[in-house]
Amino acid sequence: MAPPAKRAKRGWVPPGYKYLGPGNSLNQGEPTNPSDAAAKEHDEAYDQYIKSGKNPYLYFSPADQRFIDQTKDAKDWGGKVGHYFFRTKRAFAPKLSTDSEPGTSGVSTAGKRTKPPAHIFINQARAKKKRTSLAAQQRTQTMSDGTDQSDSGNAVQSAARVERAADGPGGSGGGGSGGGGVGVSTGSYDNQTHYKFLGDGWVEITAYSTRMVHLNMPKSENYCRVRVHNTNDTGTASHMAMDDAHEQIWTPWSLVDANAWGVWFQPSDWQYISNNMIHINLHSLDQELFNVVIKTVTEQNTGAEAIKVYNNDLTAAMMVALDSNNILPYTPAIDNQETLGFYPWKPTIPSPYRYYFSCDRNLSVTYKDEAGTITDTMGLASGLNSQFFTIENTQRINLLRTGDEYATGTYYFDTEPIRLTHTWQTNRHLGQPPQITELPSSDTANATLTARGYRSGLTQIQGRNDVTEATRVRPAQVGFCQPHDNFETSRAGPFKVPVVPADITQGLDHDANGSLRYTYDKQHGQSWASQNNKDRYTWDAVNYDSGRWTNNCFIQSVPFTSEPNANQILTNRDNLAGKTDIHFTNAFNSYGPLTAFPHPAPIYPQGQIWDKELDLEHKPRLHTQAPFVCKNNAPGQLLVRLAPNLTDQYDPNSSNLSRIVTYGTFFWKGKLTLKAKMRPNATWNPVFQISATNQGTNDYMSIERWLPTATGNITNVPLLSRPVARNTY
């Protein structure tokens, strides 16, 4: 008799949880909710404490504090109970003596700083002594001869910040902390991807990303409601598709956006994930800003002798806001290819934050050379629909100076997993094939079926007994015909109706099957050798079961006949409404209750990763390019700007704002955690996978596409995301 299967130790766990409670095994599978995930991380940290000879049960540890931070907004009862339990422990238990919190995957916890080596403190003391002496000299000089002092009063103040910062690590979790001045606030520049194999085929993927970000002062300190009305285009007949008319709110803030696959993964990582994983889901996101440096620019002399002088400004500030409650309009920067970019070794800039403002639009629909008056107007602001948001009134703003840092804390995603395999089974491939009566006598011969009049099967054709592969009814409709190149008009003007991305079939019907057209710059994959133009490509979805070959679609009359004449069939050669270039497939929609179709695939590197759910009672089933739609709030938009750096000429009543020319740099670092499942092997034949070919082969996958030239020029073109096939039915 076989021994009984061993079960993981459960300990005391409330109903609906796997890790929230004492005495659990660390191998209970996937956590049930964010509070349970925090409990799992807490248990893993306790396990590391115990292995290092410490007793975390009798002392309050950093792991306890992190659990408190992660469950502060918990909605479930277990998370709330655990949160207040450890807050009570913090009030009464002594603090665990530890230099650093143990990790569970061999990497430091995001938002924490490793303790500086001893020589740092020696250098700090020397620097403090030097700065104090310099400040005293400057004060003496100022009192004796009235010479202007630069940063003199700030020197001792900066040294005091150094001493405070040296006492312990910087703060984290949704706020800024004193970094201690120039040369003290340090961090790690990490763009690695870690794979932690959890058992049962599950993999935890942790992608780190770091960028150096350059930030200029805003063009204006004001919010501006600006209007675009390109009447030179739209005032001409037939130019409706050139319409750019709109109003937007321009803000003095910038958006730090990492919502693109290329920000997080290098091409070889994406190759590994796509070739080996069957599905993937988002888990958590952490972000931090550190090593803030703010400089002022002054110009000496004039004319040909003019030179610019750059100085560190230790009193200027950078403002940081995190819209964690999604109050502000949601504006993914990848829509315009304005993320942090795909090259970790290249400095980048944030995207100017702006959003649409309500404005009615009226534009005549015309054709080329049509005579008559064209209506081309824009309305005024509506009291009913106007929404003007300011960051200063809706967000808590942190002020960072040179050397300071900021951490967002951990955001946990609530999304559905997506598949990383494609399916080839169309309607014609569902179910049981027809029966073969005679097998081929040679490798080049065809098989023989039962005569049509003697076949059994199911059809939905009345008055005819033909059972063929074309007339048989399958259990569902895979994919569907959808109207394409359809422009509808709302209050804001005409817009192209989005089409579900599907494969393009043999007919290369890109428009009919929703192929996506990307236009992008050098930070997002364009050849760095290009001059004053953009790179473009068309993304055709790898979903071989969902596309339609519209040129070969047809509709037959009733009653059905197997040999229709011209009056009994509608084909793509029959024009619609007398328009010789428009056919019924342009407007035909076959979507219905029996329709099944795949989710849009992730698009590497230019595609969006996650999106916000529309706040409407009836939600779309999917979004055009983002495979993950957050069920609750999406990750908060991270906004930055330089605070006004004014001169002594400032006049609040003047339209001219006298500012010191200021710019800054900082390092952004993110940690994106995903959960994936390894793809099991099933077929006898080898499967297709992403693989590079030799240089100079003129092949799409030629390795030279991802290699730099002698002068550093490089490109980053899209890779397949669903190379391996699977069964649907």
Swiss-Prot record:
Residues 1-10 have a biased composition (Basic residues). Transmembrane segments: none annotated. GO terms for molecular function: metal ion binding; structural molecule activity. This is Capsid protein VP1. It is found in: Virion; Host nucleus. SUPFAM superfamilies: ssDNA viruses. Capsid protein self-assembles to form an icosahedral capsid with a T=1 symmetry, about 22 nm in diameter, and consisting of 60 copies of two size variants of the capsid proteins, VP1 and VP2, which differ by the presence of an N-terminal extension in the minor protein VP1. The capsid encapsulates the genomic ssDNA. Capsid proteins are responsible for the attachment to host cell receptors. This attachment induces virion internalization predominantly through clathrin-dependent endocytosis. GO terms for biological process: clathrin-dependent endocytosis of virus by host cell; microtubule-dependent intracellular transport of viral material towards nucleus; symbiont entry into host cell via permeabilization of host membrane; viral penetration into host nucleus; virion attachment to host cell. A motif (Nuclear localization signal) lies at residues 4-13. Keywords: Capsid protein, Clathrin-mediated endocytosis of virus by host, Cytoplasmic inwards viral transport, Host nucleus, Host-virus interaction, Magnesium, Metal-binding, Microtubular inwards viral transport, T=1 icosahedral capsid protein, Viral attachment to host cell, Viral penetration into host cytoplasm, Viral penetration into host nucleus, Viral penetration via permeabilization of host membrane, Virion, Virus endocytosis by host, Virus entry into host cell. The N-terminus of VP1 is sequestered within the mature capsid. It contains a phospholipase A2-like region and putative nuclear localization signals. The keyword Metal-binding applies.
